[in-house]
Amino acid sequence: MLLAGNIIVILMMLFVGNIGRFNPVDYPLLANLGLGFPILLVFNFVFLVVWCFLRLRTIWFPLLGFLLCYGPIRTYSPFNIPEDKPHGAIKVLSYNVFMFSSWSEPDAKKNPIVDYIVKSKADIVCLQEAQATLDDKDHIYSTLKKHYPYFKLMIKKAPGADYMVLLSKYPVLWQDSIPYGSSSNQSVAYMLDIKGTNTLVVNNHFESNGLSSGDKEGFKTLVKGELKTGEAKRQSVHLITKLGDVSARRAPQAETVARYVKKYLDKKVPVILCGDFNDSPLSYTHRTIAKELNDCFVESGNGPGIS
């Protein structure tokens, strides 16, 4: 019975770890199963411990499971030996600043988000949801411009739409909005002259999950086990359906950006792509974008990228 359970967990790990191969447009209900991948890893580790005490010769089952899922595990939670940064490396910061939380601290000089960006000393900064006053009453943009000679703002012309900001220490030759279907989210491309090399920088804010405060509260109640069986099932179906629908809208956005980027990669133009994907590392969105690129977090980061 235990062995059968371990095999089932391993098969689920393989399926969920590769869930990004399924397009959410066709399989919306599967789109967010990747969120459960770490839970399956924990279950498999528990089996590893159990076999150590009960039947040592069976320990290779969970070990094989980890080996078969090496790719998804490394994508979700990479581990790398720390190394010195290479000569000539540049520092890039991507940050969804959520309007700089200016309602809690309207003074840019005291705003912790602005302070963090300045102190990061990043060479290139890509900001999402970077709404600030255009007349500079909050002094946010002017404060950032003091530290970055090149400032680009792209505003989507729709009520409540996104502000995308690029801060750069390198010259910005042009900026371009990457068109895809979204009422508020957007992706913006910039061509930068980085030490004499034209480099494409892409700042993304893919479709938000759009969970209401009621949805979030319902999820918390669900996790705490405070709902009756019928209500818990209804709440689960509601959340899975809603997240699946959003994933189906996000998929073609990622495909559009991937096609845009590939045009420049085919011309041997270096590409730096970052942003708020609103999705998990094992998602179709991430897989589509990363197909032609190197994931810097996987290559040099450590642990799960929790934010």
Give residue spans per PLM region:
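Membrane-embedded alpha-helical segments of integral membrane proteins
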Residues: 3-55
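Active site of divalent-metal-dependent phosphoester/diester hydrolases
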Residues: 25-35, 150-166, 238-272, 277-307
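Transmembrane alpha-helices and immediately adjacent membrane-cytoplasm interface residues
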Residues: 41-84
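Structured beta-strand-rich core segments of catalytic domains in phosphoester-bond hydrolases
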Residues: 66-87, 104, 115, 124-221
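Active-site-proximal beta-strand elements of phosphoester/diester hydrolases
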Residues: 89-101, 198-207, 236-243
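Residue-level marker for buried hydrophobic side chains located in beta-strands
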Residues: 92-93, 126, 273
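Stable alpha-helical elements in mature extracytoplasmic
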Residues: 109-113, 136, 140, 250-257, ...
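A solvent-exposed, charged loop/short amphipathic helix patch at secondary-structure junctions
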Residues: 216-243
